[in-house]
């Protein structure tokens, strides 16, 4: 039985409307909207909520959707990790999990949210009290990615962090830091994504943008510096060892085996040692040559 609380819902709605109104007045909101449009066009699920959207929320419909999602638990997967007594938890699972309704039907994802293919470049200006420029670069490549390749992309991510710290932050003094994130997704389709984000002074973006691409191009052409790769491996090994005591780490490994069919844990350290500069070079080339580049640049201009 779903517990209802109309007053709590109304209070939540009011808080959300105030928050959404504040977002409307934030210059960064225009940047986020532009990134979403570049990546997903006008996909309704990726559309930013507005005050009008919150005002139209239907509490009864929300409860109905909630009940529908738990009406058939046949294809649910449950994972329990941590310091638990298996004998003590078994009756709880029998009481709260095993009693969930289940039928023979299985659901399939029919409307996946996919990043649009092709190149997209969006540059625009926004009035600001304190002008700054924000840059977001994304590229992705579809295709199956093995557990070892996942580790290769993890090392490339770390190498790029070091490269951009040296070239963009220290040599150019153009930003506090460049954020890079390379992630491997298995669902809804296998793909690897690279996202690069930084903020800088509006007068420096023309200098810094080419450096971002040039540094990735150098790795794709010549491979990473030996010291960068070594540091990336050392950090990956240390992180791997440190994470062994974290529940979240083991939960991720269960997800890997349950949904993706591979066990990165079994060969992590041996795979790590086998990765060469050529592997990193190939990964960089894959991302650099992918035709799905998205570049969004918001240039702040003074409204004084």
Regions found by a protein language model. Name each.
Residues 178, 278-285:
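Mature hydrolase/peptidase catalytic cores and their serpin-fold inhibitory cores, especially
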Residues 94-98, 155, 213:
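Short, solvent-exposed amphipathic alpha-helical segments in soluble enzyme
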Residues 42, 77-135, 139-141, 302-304:
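An aromatic/glycine/proline-enriched structural segment found at the starts
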Residues 147-161:
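Active/ligand-binding-proximal structured segments within catalytic/core domains
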Residues 1, 10-21, 27-54, 73-81, ...:
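M16 family metallopeptidases and their MPP-like homologs
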Residues 166:
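Long, His/Glu/Asp-enriched segments that create or flank divalent metal/ion-associated functional microenvironments
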